[in-house]
């Protein structure tokens, strides 16, 4: 870590610090994550594709980097850039195979350190997530020029990104023990902990590209269909929405997480919108309006469904309801068909990192598939 670096926002705000990770230029949407742990899971989450993540935890890197906690295949880092306050000068964890900065350099991720991340977060909280860039080394230039580079990039609004993070080829994750069910999982940016949760429950997962057709899904004769998390604007995902409607029409049990919640919502007739600064953290409370229970959840989303708590609405597939909302701001956190054949949540029951309050939803999906046999 050495040399000057700058985080430049599209509204002209500039934060000067030191280079952290690779040297050069990176562009993306500036967002912040309030998680106090789990930075490796955050960096490797495909949902952060094309985003510069600002860490609110004051010190990052204490536990280094290991070969077990990544949420992407091949341990790929998906964030566009990383901004931290105080990078740990030493690694202290028995599983660590190297330092965080070494891994950022190896994967050519441009970052910045020694900036006032609290000031950055307050700015983004007030002004909203926005286009940004991190510049160091030869990429540094006059601030006005850097602002123009930042403004010239594509907005996250209207960005179709699921295909950029999805697997190009189908693959299978085998269950632990005898197979009980087969699930077709549409990879829109799937985290590796999701198939692991299925595997622990005896589910064989056929992970399919985001371009998969309903015919390809039906050929697998799955007991259920899963819609994964992922990046980008759900309003662009017309193909996936159309496939989801065919799945609903066929009566196949369906479960969605995060981006998958927005896809199911769109398939049921709801619209989506871009949030001011989104939900990104591991301590976000969600109300289940069927039971009144509150779960503390892990979340990572900058778009949401339009709707109100407990709202019922008609769809071509029967009555549906807004099943969950955020206790902090009322944002829609789940939808379902009234007959229970399809349901989804905006948060991450697989956690990684985060609480396991909502892990029971995987068992709920199994109950749905059992009842459909």
From Swiss-Prot:
CDD domains: GATase1_CPSase. It catalyses: hydrogencarbonate + L-glutamine + 2 ATP + H2O = carbamoyl phosphate + L-glutamate + 2 ADP + phosphate + 2 H(+). Pfam families: CPSase_sm_chain, GATase. One of its GO terms (biological process) is L-arginine biosynthetic process. Keywords: Amino-acid biosynthesis, Arginine biosynthesis, ATP-binding, Glutamine amidotransferase, Ligase, Nucleotide-binding, Pyrimidine biosynthesis. It is an enzyme of class 6 (ligase). L-glutamine binds at residues 47, 230, 232, 259, 262, 300, 302-303. It comes from the Bacteria. Residues 1-179 are annotated as: CPSase. Pathway: Amino-acid biosynthesis; L-arginine biosynthesis; carbamoyl phosphate from bicarbonate: step 1/1; Pyrimidine metabolism; UMP biosynthesis via de novo pathway; (S)-dihydroorotate from bicarbonate: step 1/3. Residues 182-373 form the Glutamine amidotransferase type-1 domain. SMART domains: CPSase_sm_chain. Its EC number is 6.3.5.5. One of its GO terms (molecular function) is carbamoyl-phosphate synthase (glutamine-hydrolyzing) activity. The active site is at 258 (nucleophile), 348, 350. Composed of two chains; the small (or glutamine) chain promotes the hydrolysis of glutamine to ammonia, which is used by the large (or ammonia) chain to synthesize carbamoyl phosphate. Tetramer of heterodimers (alpha,beta)4. Small subunit of the glutamine-dependent carbamoyl phosphate synthetase (CPSase). CPSase catalyzes the formation of carbamoyl phosphate from the ammonia moiety of glutamine, carbonate, and phosphate donated by ATP, constituting the first step of 2 biosynthetic pathways, one leading to arginine and/or urea and the other to pyrimidine nucleotides. The small subunit (glutamine amidotransferase) binds and cleaves glutamine to supply the large subunit with the substrate ammonia. Belongs to the CarA family. This is Carbamoyl phosphate synthase small chain. It comes from Mycolicibacterium paratuberculosis (strain ATCC BAA-968 / K-10). The lineage of its organism: Bacteria, Bacillati, Actinomycetota, Actinomycetes, Mycobacteriales.
């Amino acid at each position: 870590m050495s040399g000057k670096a700058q985080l430049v926002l599209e509204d002209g705000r500039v934060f000067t610090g030191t280079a952290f990770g690779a040297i050069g230029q990176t562009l993306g949407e500036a967002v912040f994550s309030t998680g106090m742990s789990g930075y490796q899971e955050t960096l490797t989450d495909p949902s952060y594709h094309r985003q510069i993540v600002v860490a609110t935890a004051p010190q990052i890197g204490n536990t280094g980097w290991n070969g077990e906690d990544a949420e992407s295949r091949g341990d790929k880092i998906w964030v566009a850039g990383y901004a931290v306050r105080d990078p740990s000068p030493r690694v202290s964890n028995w599983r660590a195979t190297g330092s965080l900065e070494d891994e950022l350099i190896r994967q050519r991720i441009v970052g910045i350190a020694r900036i006032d991340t609290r000031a950055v977060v307050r700015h983004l909280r007030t002004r909203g997530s926005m286009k940004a860039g991190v510049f160091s080394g030869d990429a540094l230039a006059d601030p006005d020029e850097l602002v123009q580079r930042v403004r010239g990039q594509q907005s996250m609004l209207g960005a179709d990104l699921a295909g950029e993070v999805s697997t190009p080829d189908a693959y299978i994750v085998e269950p632990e023990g005898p197979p009980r069910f087969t699930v077709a999982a549409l990879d829109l940016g799937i985290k590796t902990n999701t198939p692991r949760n299925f595997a622990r429950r005896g589910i064989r997962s056929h992970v399919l590209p985001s371009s998969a057709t309903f015919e390809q899904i039906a050929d697998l004769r799955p007991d259920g269909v899963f819609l994964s998390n992922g990046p980008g604007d759900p309003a662009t995902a017309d193909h996936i929405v159309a496939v989801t409607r065919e799945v609903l029409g066929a009566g196949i049990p369906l479960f969605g997480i995060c981006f998958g919640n927005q896809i199911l919502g769109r398939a049921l007739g709801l619209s989506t919108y871009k949030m001011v600064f989104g939900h990104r953290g591991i301590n976000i409370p969600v109300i289940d309006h069927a039971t009144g229970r509150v779960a503390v959840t892990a979340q990572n989303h900058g778009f949401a469904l339009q709707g109100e708590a407990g709202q019922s609405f008609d769809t071509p597939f029967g009555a549906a309801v807004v099943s969950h909302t955020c206790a902090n701001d009322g944002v829609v956190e789940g939808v379902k068909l009234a007959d229970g054949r399809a349901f989804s949540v905006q948060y991450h029951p697989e956690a990684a990192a985060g609480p396991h309050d909502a892990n029971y939803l995987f068992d709920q999906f199994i109950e749905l598939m059992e009842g459909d046999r």
